Amino acid sequence: MVKAIRKLSLIQKIMIGIVIGTTLGFLVPEWTFISVLGELFVGALKAIAPILVFVLIIASLAQQKAGAKTYVGSILVVYLLATFLAAVVAVTASYLFPVKIVLEAAQEAQAAPTQLSDVLSNVLTSVVQNPIQAMIEGNYLSVLFWSSLIGIGLRQSSVATKDVIANLSTGITTVVQMIIGIAPIGILGLVFHSVATTGIAGLAKYGQLLLLLIGTMAVVALVVYPAIVFWNIRQNPYPLVFFVLKESAIPAFFTRSSAANIPINMELAKAMDLNEESYAVSIPLGATINMGGAAITITIMTLAAVHTLGMSVPIYLALLLSIIAAVSACGASGIAGGSLLLIPLACSLFGISNDIAMQVVGVGFIVGVVQDSIETALNSSSDLLFTTSVELADRRKNGEIIDVKALIGKSQLVVEQENI
């Protein structure tokens, strides 16, 4: 029995954990101790992720030779473009399928930013936070900033110093692999908690809104993002898209944390033999900047409020909303509460009062059980998707023959061997 389980791939083990967690959640919801398994798993990932990012970036930059090629600039452009396109799709979907919501008493929440300048100020200020405090709080903009400076500063250090840093990086990567190995048990606990505390009835009231959110994110994940990948690699993007959805989006869906999924994306990038000097920066950066799912949430929730209030929206204002949603979504990870607390900012564009906007936020918390999971899955998996596609595009331009299916097959073999 044990040997048979060990032969299963990590994703197969996770699916078994999902089934067991769902079953126990329905049958014995009072067994709350099972939820602790999920809390421990997510806590471990969140704890190790900032350290992993900090050390990996220092190690890669310290050993980087002058003039070495990286793809971070190109990946950043793709991140921003993808986030904007996601917002445009959300606006289009909201016009085609207008949804109204019941606005009841406003739910108490933390103060949300009321101006775009507040979001930008928050992001820029967070960059220069104390690096130790940044790792404790999971502030990846600051972690990226300081680790990059330290890594560049260590380029002139001795070979022995660089070897110590490289060995430390290897050791932390091994710890990450150990934590990822217990993902099936952790996800079992997460699924149990979700089913036991919420169930199906709690979400039925907001079915139309949920369907619009889920449908829009599905279109972006299966149509818009593959189109961007096709433009880069000039071949069928879906083998890569489905590989990333299976290996990265599923864990992200259940952890509901882009930060917790960074180590998983790092391991997958390593398995695909990507440029470490690029992905060590682009994947943590994507957890902060690549926020297509957040842009969709902000846009759809805002326009749902607009439709509920019977307001008419001219096309230029809808386009402006797309831009604001895309820009503010990039700061969602720097604000407690994520994308939901940026809804009042978007609502202010239409003159909607803060009281009503906070009611919309309250609805967001209710549907967030599903919405937040899918949003995180879309955001985090696309970090790996775009990082891979941009590097493959550069290889193609340099005359290298790109075989995506062979690359995926090789990486799947590496992932399965590491998790046996």
From Swiss-Prot:
Methyltransferase as UniProt keyword: no
GO cellular component: plasma membrane
Membrane association type: Multi-pass membrane protein
InterPro entries: Na-dicarboxylate_symporter, Na:dicarbo_symporter_sf, Ser_Thr_transp_SstT
UniProt entry tagged with the keyword Membrane: yes
Subcellular location(s) of the protein: Cell membrane
Broad class of where this protein is predominantly found: membrane
UniProt-listed GO biological process terms: serine transport; threonine transport
The protein's role, per its UniProt record: Involved in the import of serine and threonine into the cell, with the concomitant import of sodium (symport system).
HAMAP family: Ser_Thr_transp_SstT
Protein name: Serine/threonine transporter SstT
The organism's taxonomic lineage, starting at the top: Bacteria, Bacillati, Bacillota, Bacilli, Lactobacillales
